[in-house]
Amino acid sequence: QVLVDLDGDPLYNGMSYYILPVARGKGGGLELARTGSESCPRTVVQTRSETSRGLPARLASPYRILIGSNIPLTIEFQPQKPYSCHGHSSRSLQWKVEKTQMVKIASSDEEQRLFGPFQIQPYRNHYKLVYCESESRNHHDDCRDLGISIDDQQNRLLVVKNGDPLVVQFAKANRGGDD
């Protein structure tokens, strides 16, 4: 099944999109924040403002031109203004899941992957993001939802959960005048 953006156009491999919540009133798109003792923003969070689109995220898969459901993806933020503290990788900030089950960005080239453990799956007429421990396309049983968990500083952390996914939609990030 080919996935579509808010305009009804297919999601294209290698293109950047804002990942936005379907539900209103609980925050906006996804971005990076400092959590814990981080000196540089490395944690993927939902913005507190529902009017904020967050950061554009590039969706990439080795399999097809169009992004379909249940295919392995890498997801990486592509901020227009690089974070100086991220050094050489500031233009491509690939997502990964840490042992804490929080989604963070890879801190080194060694942690980055050619194709990733994430997938987009249809969910209640929209979509959800999932994390799959197995990189095989046929192991859907190994996939768990990505949802929101609120920490002590009221950050809306993107985390691996059993159930209660963040239901999302995709808006093109490269439209003239939008950025």
Curated annotation (Swiss-Prot):
Disulfide bonds join 40-85, 132-143. It is found in: Secreted. The record marks 64-65 as: Reactive bond for trypsin. Keywords: Disulfide bond, Protease inhibitor, Pyrrolidone carboxylic acid, Secreted, Serine protease inhibitor. GO terms for cellular component: extracellular region. One of its GO terms (molecular function) is serine-type endopeptidase inhibitor activity. Abundant in dry seeds. InterPro entries: Kunitz_inhibitor_STI-like_sf, Prot_inh_Kunz-lg. The modification Pyrrolidone carboxylic acid is found at residue 1. Pfam families: Kunitz_legume (PF00197). Its main location: secreted. Transmembrane segments: none annotated. Heterodimer of an alpha and a beta chain linked by a disulfide bond. Inhibits trypsin, plasmin, human plasma kallikrein, chymotrypsin and factor XIIa activity. There are two isoforms of the beta chain with slightly different molecular masses: 4764 and 4765 Da. These isoforms differ in their N- and C-terminal amino acids. Belongs to the protease inhibitor I3 (leguminous Kunitz-type inhibitor) family. This is Trypsin inhibitor. It comes from Leucaena leucocephala (White popinac).
